[in-house]
C-alpha cells in the first residue's frame, strides 16, 4: 500500500486469473482455452495487416468486425458493440447500465469477476443461490433489482439455462437490464441474440477467446437494443476510443466469416467433452451436465484441492476454486483427445 493511492484502492479485491504456466510440457486444462488454433483465414487476414498501415490508428468503431457480427446473427450494426475482450465489454456494462442504487442480481456460483466489478464501481449486489443441482431458478430473480447478469452456460458449472427460461426472466424484469454472458454458448447452447429484437432490456455478450480460438487477441462483443449499445459507446469513448487494434479487427471479422472452420472445431470439442465425461464417470466422478468447453466434476472419495495438486505433480493443470459450496469440484478444460488422455492417465 502506498500513500499515493486513492482511498478506494485499498479496499478493492481484484480478480485472480487462471495460471498461465511457463513450462511448455504441462498439459494445460485450467483456463478454458480452445485446444485448436484460430481459423487459417483469420491468421491470413492478420498477416495482411503487418504493413506500413500500422503507423495509422485503427478504426475506432471497428466497423468491419461489427458488420461481420451483424451479418452472422442477422442484426444491424447499430445493435453491436465491440471491445478489447468481453471483460472490457462487461466492465463498460457494469459502469454504464447497473448503477441505479438497487442490488445487481447474479448467481452465487458464477463468474468471479462480477463482484470485482461491483467493488470497482460501487454497485450493491445480491448473490442468488443456485438450486441443489447448480441450476438457475428463474423465479428467484423476480424481486426488486437494478439489473441481472449471469453466464450461460454458467461458469464454472457449465450448466445451461434454456432459451425459454431466459425469456421468462426477461418478461418478469421488463424494467431492468438483463445481461446474458455467452462466453461458452457455442459448445452446446442456443444464443439469446434471437431475442434482442423483442426485448429492449436484453444485452448479450460474447467473446472470441473460446469457440473462435482467439484468447490471445482480446476481442469481445455485445448485441442488444441500440439504446443500450449507445450507452456502451459513450462509456468506451470516455475511456479508450481505440480498444481494438488493426489486426484484431480483421482477424476477428475473418473468424466470424469462416463458418466451416468454426463448426468443425466446436464439433471436435463437443465430441471430446462427451468422451471425457464417460471416462471420468467410469472412474467414479460426478460430472455436472455441461454445455461448455469444460466440465465441473468431483469424486466422492477425493479431496479436490489435493487431487489438483497431485495432478499438477504429474504435469496436468486443472482449476480448483476455494469457494465453500464448490470446494470439492474441479473445473477441467476440454483439450484434444491426447490432452484428455493425459488427464486420465494421471488419474490412473
UniProtKB/Swiss-Prot annotation:
<keyword id="KW-0028">Amino-acid biosynthesis</keyword>
<dbReference type="InterPro" id="IPR005861">
    <property type="entry name" value="HisP_aminotrans"/>
</dbReference>
<keyword id="KW-0032">Aminotransferase</keyword>
<keyword id="KW-0808">Transferase</keyword>
<dbReference type="GO" id="GO:0030170">
    <property type="term" value="F:pyridoxal phosphate binding"/>
</dbReference>
<protein>
    <recommendedName>
        <fullName>Histidinol-phosphate aminotransferase</fullName>
        <ecNumber>2.6.1.9</ecNumber>
    </recommendedName>
</protein>
<dbReference type="GO" id="GO:0004400">
    <property type="term" value="F:histidinol-phosphate transaminase activity"/>
</dbReference>
<dbReference type="InterPro" id="IPR015421">
    <property type="entry name" value="PyrdxlP-dep_Trfase_major"/>
</dbReference>
<feature type="modified residue" description="N6-(pyridoxal phosphate)lysine">
    <location>
        <position position="210"/>
    </location>
</feature>
<comment type="similarity">
    <text>Belongs to the class-II pyridoxal-phosphate-dependent aminotransferase family. Histidinol-phosphate aminotransferase subfamily.</text>
</comment>
<comment type="pathway">
    <text>Amino-acid biosynthesis; L-histidine biosynthesis; L-histidine from 5-phospho-alpha-D-ribose 1-diphosphate: step 7/9.</text>
</comment>
<keyword id="KW-0663">Pyridoxal phosphate</keyword>
<dbReference type="InterPro" id="IPR050106">
    <property type="entry name" value="HistidinolP_aminotransfase"/>
</dbReference>
<dbReference type="InterPro" id="IPR001917">
    <property type="entry name" value="Aminotrans_II_pyridoxalP_BS"/>
</dbReference>
<dbReference type="InterPro" id="IPR015424">
    <property type="entry name" value="PyrdxlP-dep_Trfase"/>
</dbReference>
<dbReference type="InterPro" id="IPR004839">
    <property type="entry name" value="Aminotransferase_I/II_large"/>
</dbReference>
<dbReference type="InterPro" id="IPR015422">
    <property type="entry name" value="PyrdxlP-dep_Trfase_small"/>
</dbReference>
<dbReference type="Pfam" id="PF00155">
    <property type="entry name" value="Aminotran_1_2"/>
</dbReference>
<keyword id="KW-0368">Histidine biosynthesis</keyword>
<dbReference type="GO" id="GO:0000105">
    <property type="term" value="P:L-histidine biosynthetic process"/>
</dbReference>
<comment type="subunit">
    <text>Homodimer.</text>
</comment>
